[in-house]
Each structure stands twice: as C-alpha cells, then as structure tokens.
Design a protein with these regions (language model features):
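Cytosolic, low-complexity regulatory segments enriched in Ser/Pro/Gly with interspersed Lys/Arg
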Residues: 1-28, 32
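C-terminal interaction modules of eukaryotic adaptor/scaffold proteins
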Residues: 11, 25, 157, 171-201
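N-terminal low-complexity tails and the immediately adjacent first alpha-helix
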Residues: 34-36
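Primarily EF-hand calcium-binding motifs
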Residues: 38-56, 62-67, 73-101, 109-123, ...
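HEAT-repeat alpha-solenoid elements in large eukaryotic scaffold proteins
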Residues: 53-57, 136-139
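Conserved beta-strand elements of beta-rich interaction domains across eukaryotes
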Residues: 61, 66-67, 98, 104, ...
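A contiguous pocket-lining binding segment that forms or flanks enzyme active sites
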Residues: 115-138
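Strongly charged, low-complexity linkers/loops
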Residues: 136-157
Length: 201
C-alpha cells in the first residue's frame, strides 16, 4: 500500500483533531440564542478557531482585539476562567455558547452568579478584598487610556474599599453570593447596569 502524500496526511490529522459541535437544534434548545444567532456566532468562532476549540492564550489574543487602548490580558484570563470547565484549559464551541448565553441572555440571578464567579478567582465561594482588587485592577488595565484622569494603585484601593464595604454587609471580610445578589438587586440603578450585559456581549 502506497504511503499517503503530505497533504493527505495533514487533511487526515486535521479531521481527527477538529472538534465537531452539537446539532444546531440541540444548541438552540439549551441556550437562549436562536438558530440564526447561533449560526452567526459559530461562523465567527470557526473563523478565529478553525479547530473548534480555544485555549487561554488564544482567548486572550482574541479578547484584546476589542480593547486596543489598554491591556486586556489579565481581564481576559479571569473571563476565560468563568467559561472554562474546572481542570481544563480549553473551551469548545458549546461551552463558549452556553457561557455567552448565560451572560447575555440569562436571568438577573444568572448574571449576578457569573459576575460573582468572575471576582471569585479561586472558586471557593467567597470574594476577598484581594480578589476584588485583582479584578478591578484588570478592568482599569483593560480600559487603558480611555480612563481620565489616569488612575494609580491608590485609586484602585480606594475604589475597592468603598465597594467592598457596601457589599460586605456583615463585615466579615468576604463577600458571599447572597450578599452580592442583595446588593445588586437593592436598587434600580444596579439592576440596569446588569441589563447592559445584554448588549455588551
């Protein structure tokens, strides 16, 4: 039997490792996106991630294209952590779509839970002041020159202290999901801020 040429081998291995997503109807039934929206999202995903999966480095690169005036690396890492299943370092299309659906089209509780998971960096069920500082610093880095006046470490610390003390109602030094949910839903302004996720994503 003759050996396959190099192009045939590349095509074979490409087919072997390429991830195949679920059927369109199935994806539409488990997310809050229409079939047309899923097709549109998949086209963009496949163009940027032709193998059907994305690792953290690739995710950071893609994310940074939306924020050219700042450094999106750290914030993208935190977002990736909320999308990526525990113990893995890769996202397939279903996982990406499910997370996107939750953030963009989920209930108010879904959105609050996602925000909580973003700040709960070590996933222990609590947000510490250190974790909040890490994420807020990443947001400032992400926005870069768009922030005026330019903020320093002292600004970040003051911002975190003010917000943390508002949410940590029992003063035990950590924020729980319940405290986060109570704070986010206590007035209309906070709720409207969460509704902006519908258009941001």
């Amino acid at each position: 039997m003759a050996l396959a040429n190099e192009e045939d081998m590349e095509a074979f291995f490409s087919d072997v490792v390429r991830y195949r997503p679920q059927e369109l109807n199935q994806l539409a039934s488990v997310t809050k996106f229409s079939r047309r929206e899923i097709q549109h999202i998949y086209r963009g995903f496949k163009q940027e991630c032709p193998l059907g999966t994305v690792d953290e480095d690739r995710f950071k690169h893609l994310f940074s294209q939306f924020f050219p005036f700042g450094d999106a690396t750290k914030y993208a890492q935190f977002v990736f952590g909320t999308f990526c299943p525990p113990g893995t370092n890769i996202i397939n299309f279903e996982e990406f779509l499910s997370s996107l659906s939750l953030v963009a089209r989920g209930s108010l509780h879904d959105k609050i839970a996602w925000i909580f998971s973003l700040y709960d960096i070590n996933h222990d069920g609590f947000i510490t002041k250190h974790e909040m500082t890490e994420v807020v610093s990443a947001i400032y880095e992400l926005l870069g020159h768009a922030i005026e006046p330019v903020l320093d470490a002292g600004s970040v610390e003051r911002h975190v202290n003010a917000v943390f003390d508002l949410i940590d109602t029992n003063g035990d030094g950590v924020i729980t999901l319940d405290e986060m949910e109570r704070w986010c839903t206590r007035d209309e302004g906070n709720t409207k801020s969460l509704d902006m996720l519908n258009t941001v994503w």
